[in-house]
Amino acid sequence: MKTTFLKACAVAALALTIAGSASAHRAWMLPSSFTLSGEGQWVTVDGAISNNLFYPNHVAMNLDSVTITGPDGAAVEAQNKASGKYRSVFDVALEKEGTYRISSGGDGYTASWEEAGERKRWRGNAEALKAEGIEAKPGVEVSRSVRRIETFVTLGAPNEAAFATKGTGLELKPITHPNDVYAGEEVSFQLLMDGAAAEGVEVEIIRGSDRYRNSEDGLKLTTNAEGILTFTPEEAGAYWLSAGSEGKGTLNGKEITVRSTYVVTFEALPL
């Protein structure tokens, strides 16, 4: 099955956020350190969906879809995984020098249709959608959701092997390395949609610890024709970036709605 975007139009933080709301539920992963040096290093990563950044107070993140890409592009295992009421946690052994991509998310389908006077709803993957005959139901409405939540950690000298993209949904292609961000200096990231530059995508950036501020003091930006956004973090700290888009696609020749969300957590260091 092949799903292709016919049109991508920006919307704020679909599925993972409710932009502009003080009680927004935001998904995030936060490592114990973003940059390290030396041998035998580990990081512990927290994952949650919360009202405040990075204060777990709503629900723990599901760790079933966590993947880690090492500095050589190979998969790295998440260790000591555990989930509590409000927060999930796992460890990553940094055995090789370079940059690690830590990611969670999914690619799934939902469907709804009328049957025998009742409204039916279904959720699953592309294979089950076909195998169960869901897409053949009369009047069925199908939507696809591609979501990613990521962070990056670097041991020693940074590299870019872990930045390789998959070509599906919204993805980050760093111009500024996410572990080389400093307060007061300009940062540039590129967003891709299905492997191509994602123009006109709305992005929200918020510094953590908003629980202790009277306002979020967030930035709202829109990617340019090359999918690039440029900003300057004014203060040091951990930041949360969220982007979302919605458009029409096709599945086996039928039009469907396609939504994609992307979240990344990064750190701005003091100069």
Regions found by a protein language model. Give the residues of each.
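Short amphipathic beta-strand segments in non-cytosolic proteins
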Residues: V66-A75, E202-K220
